[in-house]
From Swiss-Prot:
InterPro entries: PEP_COase, PEP_COase_bac/pln-type, PEP_COase_Lys_AS, PEPCASE_His_AS, Pyrv/PenolPyrv_kinase-like_dom. PANTHER family: PHOSPHOENOLPYRUVATE CARBOXYLASE. Transmembrane segments: none annotated. The active site is at residues 138, 543. NCBIfam families: PRK00009.1. This is Phosphoenolpyruvate carboxylase. Its cofactor is Mg(2+). One of its GO terms (molecular function) is phosphoenolpyruvate carboxylase activity. It comes from the Bacteria. Belongs to the PEPCase type 1 family. It comes from Vibrio atlanticus (strain LGP32). GO terms for cellular component: cytosol.
Length: 876
């Protein structure tokens, strides 16, 4: 590996050596030697040695069944350890400047100065900063919580070993601890034995808050406060809340029959329980710290005659939090609920704690106030009483089914058969009616009752418990009005953000018309109180039309929505449903935000952070602080130095690129009759269904083809065999078509001057670097029927042409020239991913030959799936 990355290289080889010791202890020399042979052959084969590639294939074909699991596990574990070493490297003191972006805020302030942005405008933009990260469980984090906890501890050991003044004894002790952790990981299950329930997923989300975000939020705000004081002369207001969190875990019922209203209610209780538990930890720490006796009158009044006034106040808060835990425990376990005062709103903690904070400052103890107490006050604003706010997500047809069943019962026709105009008229009429719509004696079907019960759960909770009610597959104005009506009928006393999610290509293109229609309804304007949230779907649009076409539809929809809302004087928050992979809208955060349409971040940023990306971006406190800094600086830059409006000729060419790429994509995915059988044979798509990943089924409709597959398994399957087809198909072909039409110079100009376009091509380069045509070809040779082989050949040829087309327009000779660290990171893992790919192809070959494959083969296959996901740094 490049000498630039010496510290990382050294950590990777140390972890590899310790893993080798563990394998030797557990399985003796035979397995270790096999692993070493495969690793060396793979490295040599990657460098182009044909003889060693043939030897590698033979070596893997000749492995007996009982050796497959330990060999696969060795590479799987090594990739997890490599990921950990790399993640640690980005926050370590040895980190190179071009890797760590040492201070994104500092470089932003320099840019603002160069562009003569006034301090007044900058201060206002900071006050308006609103980053809401929405934690979602799908695509599910493939690494088990057990393993993640061990990886966090490994990170702590690496941090210790970095200290140069560590004594020989301390170093040996830390290395021994590392070896123990690696051994614990080796002897634990890599794969979950059962699918997680929605409750398990929610607990995983709370664990991320407890282990990382709880510490990261005050750290980030402290750092930002210091930066702002240096640049603006004023810090962050004490009640600033630039970053906060919502969650879909336990609220997302779209296509997940296991998320019921009962589950949602339980997750809300668990969320409050965890918040009270974490605040209790803070309060206990403050009791030990705030032993001072000098205080102002306000604190004296709160504390009464107690000598240690601060402690007296804190002890009363401790009682309140203990009561809250006791009451919630009783509710969670269906026990008798004690009648005690509990924490209902944040002011119960904020008011007394803020009084203590002011008193300490007034009494000359500001340095104490600005320690743990300030951290707790910052947390109160970020996490509230509920820790994370819960989104409810439901598919649009589930709401129209309720109204259809109801109107038939009332004898006024079938809502589903009405025109859109009639639906809107009916809904607006009912929304303004004073009489209830739901008859008392009506007994709805089970499915309809479930939707209404969910709305009742929303109505029974305070507004702060929820983020938004998201309507997936939203297509029309009536889809949005229907949810407002159902919430109203179920007694919801407050305005809920009802957020349409536009997912397919057609729905994105139609989103402006739908929102304009809604905004033209006076009653609706009253409901939304001049604030509208709209969610842009990335995964389904890419699956529907390919990445190039979907990317342009998303940009164009956002641009039109921003302008439409601005004309109407409505504040718009765009909610981005990005995935972890490019085929689902994933991109490096900073670049992705700066490539959005002008003014699209004025209403703040709301974005989903998906399963495995939560761990990579938010899993350690220091890494999370880096992520917050990237988000904050990108939003401030986008709002203070907005990108130029794209030229009309750029837009026109994007329309052409979009059309050509969509056609090229659909010609293969929908038009090629052999495509679905090829997909099923060349990837582990069918086997993926057995993996106990998330709580939701892999298909919306178990009998359908590609269109019924969820976006996640669709992409996951292709990233396993290294063709990564959905993340590039159609894009390069469209670019080459435009070059052939004489648009080379215009494409080069777009590349230089338009962040949207250059980011698209940068994402394609990253995908191309992760593809491996040799591996994809090997899967075909081992697994695919002869009559389907020409299709695989055709796709690989197309990929080669596409890479040339993109490099030509960028005037680059090699992929990822401008991101050497990203390329190095992919290379580092490739040496270990490729043996797993070869093993997986062999395992698929063996399991598909058996009616009932032996358990050891199935286990080994699951291990390769998890390992390749870790190596590709994404699931789907």
């Amino acid at each position: 590996m490049n000498e630039k990355y010496a510290a990382l290289k050294s950590n990777v080889s140390m972890l590899g050596r310790l893993l080798g010791n563990t394998i030797q202890d557990a399985h003796g020399d035979v397995i270790l030697e096999k692993v070493e042979t495969i690793r060396k052959l793979s490295k040599s084969a990657r460098a182009g040695n044909k003889a060693d590639r043939d030897s590698l294939v033979e070596e893997i074909k000749n492995l007996p069944n009982e050796q497959l699991t330990p060999v696969a596990r060795a590479f799987n574990q090594f990739l997890n350890l490599t990921n950990m070493a790399e993640q640690y490297h980005t926050i370590s003191r040895h980190c190179e400047e071009h890797v760590c972006e040492p201070d994104v805020l500092q470089s932003l302030f320099s840019k603002l100065n160069q562009n003569d942005i006034s301090k007044l405008d900058a201060a206002q933009a900071v006050r308006d900063l609103n980053i809401e990260l929405v934690l979602t469980a799908h695509p599910t984090e493939i690494t088990r919580r057990t393993m993640i906890n061990k990886l966090v501890k490994i990170n702590e050991c690496l941090s210790k070993l970095e200290l140069s003044d560590l004594s020989h004894k301390e170093r040996a002790k830390t290395e021994r601890r590392l070896e123990q952790l690696i051994a614990q990981g080796w002897h634990s299950d890599v794969i979950r034995q059962q699918r997680p329930t929605p409750l398990d997923e929610a607990k995983w989300g709370f664990a991320v808050v407890e282990n990382s975000l709880w510490e990261a939020v005050p750290d980030f705000l402290r750092e930002m406060d210091g930066r702002l004081k240096g640049y603006l002369g004023e810090g962050l207001p004490i009640d600033a809340r630039p970053v906060h969190f919502s969650s879909w875990m336990g609220g997302d019922r779209d296509g997940n029959p296991f998320v019921t209203h009962t589950i949602t209610k339980e997750v809300l209780r668990l969320s409050r329980w965890k918040a009270a538990d974490l605040y209790l930890g803070d309060v206990n720490e403050l009791i030990t710290e705030l032993s001072m006796t000098k205080c102002n009158d306000a604190v004296r009044e709160l504390a009464g005659d107690e000598h240690e006034a601060y402690r007296a106040i804190l002890k009363s808060l401790r009682t309140l939090l203990n009561n809250t835990l006791e009451v919630l425990d009783a509710k969670l376990h269906d026990a008798e609920v004690p009648k005690k005062e509990t924490l209902q709103n944040i002011d119960q903690l904020w008011t007394p704690l803020y009084a203590c904070y002011q008193s300490l400052h007034e009494c000359g103890m500001g340095v104490i106030a600005d320690g743990s107490l300030l951290d707790t006050l910052r947390r109160l604003k970020a996490f509230g009483v509920h820790l994370v706010r819960l989104d409810v997500r439901q598919e649009s047809t589930r709401h129209s089914d309720v109204l259809s069943e109801l109107t038939r019962y009332l004898g006024i026709g079938d809502y589903d058969q009405w025109s859109e105009q009639d639906k809107v008229a009916f809904l607006t009429n009912e929304l303004s009616s004073k009489r209830p719509l739901l008859p008392r004696d009506w007994e709805p079907s089970e499915q309809v009752k479930e939707v209404l019960d969910t709305c009742k759960v929303v109505a029974a909770q305070p507004r702060e418990a929820f983020g938004a009610y998201v309507i997936s597959m939203a297509r029309t104005a009536s889809d949005v009005l229907a949810v407002h009506l159902l919430l109203q009928e179920c007694g919801c006393p407050y305005r809920m953000d009802v957020c349409p999610l536009f997912e397919t290509l057609d729905d994105l293109n139609n989103s402006e018309a739908v929102m304009k229609q809604l905004m033209s309804i006076d009653l609706y304007r009253g409901f939304i109180q001049n604030h509208q949230m709209v969610m842009i779907g990335y995964s389904d649009s890419a699956k529907d039309a390919g990445v190039m076409s979907a990317g342009w539809a998303q940009y164009d929809a956002m641009d039109k929505l921003v302008k439409a809302c601005e004309e109407e004087g409505i504040e718009l928050t765009l909610f981005h449903g990005r995935g972890g992979t490019v085929g689902r809208g994933g991109a490096p955060a900073h670049a992705a935000l700066l490539s959005q349409p002008p003014k699209s971040l004025k209403g703040g940023l709301r974005v989903t952070e998906q399963g495995e990306m939560i761990r990579f971006k938010l899993g350690l406190p220091d890494v999370a602080v880096n992520s917050f800094n990237l988000y904050a600086s990108a939003i401030l830059e986008a709002n203070l130095l907005p990108p130029p409006e794209p030229k009309q000729e750029w837009r026109d060419l994007m329309e052409v690129l979009s059309e050509v790429s969509c056609e090229a994509y659909r010609n293969v995915v929908r038009g090629e009759e052999k495509f679905v059988p090829y997909f099923r044979q060349a990837t582990p798509e069918l086997e993926l269904g057995k993996l106990p990943l998330g709580s939701r089924p892999a298909k919306r409709n178990p009998n359908g083809g590609v269109e019924s597959l969820r976006a996640i398994p669709w992409i996951f399957s292709w990233s396993q065999n290294r063709l990564v087809l959905p993340a590039w198909l159609g894009a390069g072909e469209a670019i080459q078509y435009s070059v052939d039409q004489g648009h080379q110079a215009l494409l080069e100009e777009m590349c230089r001057e338009w962040p949207f376009f250059s980011t698209r091509l940068g994402m394609l380069e990253m995908v191309y670097s992760k593809c491996n045509m040799e591996i994809a070809k090997y899967y075909d040779q081992r697994l695919v029927d002869e009559e389907l082989l020409p299709l695989g050949e055709l796709l690989r040829e197309q990929l080669q042409k596409d890479i040339k087309a993109v490099l030509n327009v960028e005037n680059n000779e090699n992929l990822m020239q401008s991101d050497p660290w990203g390329l190095e990171s992919i290379r580092l893992r490739n040496i270990y991913v490729e043996p797993l790919n070869m093993l997986q192809a062999e395992l698929l070959y063996r399991t598909r030959k058996c009616e009932t494959p032996p358990a050891e083969l199935e286990e080994a296959l699951m291990v390769t799936i998890a390992g390749i996901a870790a190596g590709m740094r994404n699931t789907g």
